[in-house]
């Protein structure tokens, strides 16, 4: 196994250690191959697991916006999180794709 693969595995293991919160929200994900609909399955400080109908290859750069309802974040207004990240995991489960994304950059905005 080369050094790059070992680094990726170590980073993924660290990402997995962050607490995950089950949250199912609709999202539009943009990648080089186009835009597709997805649904968050869980969210952590490091990333998001999405359920979707198509594959997004590991290593793909993606952009997506998560709209958190105000009651979830203890606010009167919803909070929008604009995210840039990369796919670190892709698998199939019961006919749907699971896609794990590490968030590299994000921006919060009240809407």
Task: Pin down the residues of each PLM region.
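Structured alpha-helical
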Residues: 1-111
């Amino acid at each position: 196994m080369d050094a790059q693969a070992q680094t990726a595995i170590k980073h993924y293991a660290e990402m997995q250690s962050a607490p995950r919160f089950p949250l199912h929200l609709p999202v539009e994900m943009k990648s080089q191959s186009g835009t597709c609909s997805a649904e968050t399955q869980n969210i952590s400080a490091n990333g998001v697991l999405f359920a979707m109908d198509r594959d997004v290859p590991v290593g793909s750069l993606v952009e997506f916006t998560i709209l958190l309802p105000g009651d979830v974040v203890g606010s009167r207004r919803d909070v929008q999180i604009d995210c840039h990240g990369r796919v670190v995991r892709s698998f199939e489960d019961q006919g749907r794709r699971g896609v794990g994304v590490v968030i590299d950059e994000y921006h919060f905005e009240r809407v």
